């Protein structure tokens, strides 16, 4: 396999993994522990 193909596949997998982790953190189980600054600072 050529080096450019390997690098492209590696970067694509890395980007997809990061996006999946970000979505899991935002909407999955850990989202219950996130604070909402708008609810904390009501005027």
From Swiss-Prot:
Q: Which residues cross the membrane?
A: 4-24
Q: Would I find Transmembrane helix among this entry's keywords?
A: yes
Q: Which domain of life is it from?
A: Eukaryota
Quote the subcellular location field of this record: Plastid, Chloroplast thylakoid membrane
- Which of UniProt's keywords are assigned here? Chloroplast, Membrane, Plastid, Thylakoid, Transmembrane, Transmembrane helix
| Pfam families, alphabetized | PsbN
Similarity field: Belongs to the PsbN family.
Q: Which HAMAP family is this protein grouped with? A: PSII_PsbN (MF_00293)
Q: What does this protein do?
A: May play a role in photosystem I and II biogenesis.
Q: State what protein this is by name.
A: Protein PsbN
């Amino acid at each position: 396999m050529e080096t450019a193909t390997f690098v492209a596949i590696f970067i694509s997998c890395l980007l997809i993994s990061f996006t999946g982790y970000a979505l899991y953190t935002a909407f999955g189980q850990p989202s219950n522990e996130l604070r909402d600054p708008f609810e904390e600072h009501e005027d």
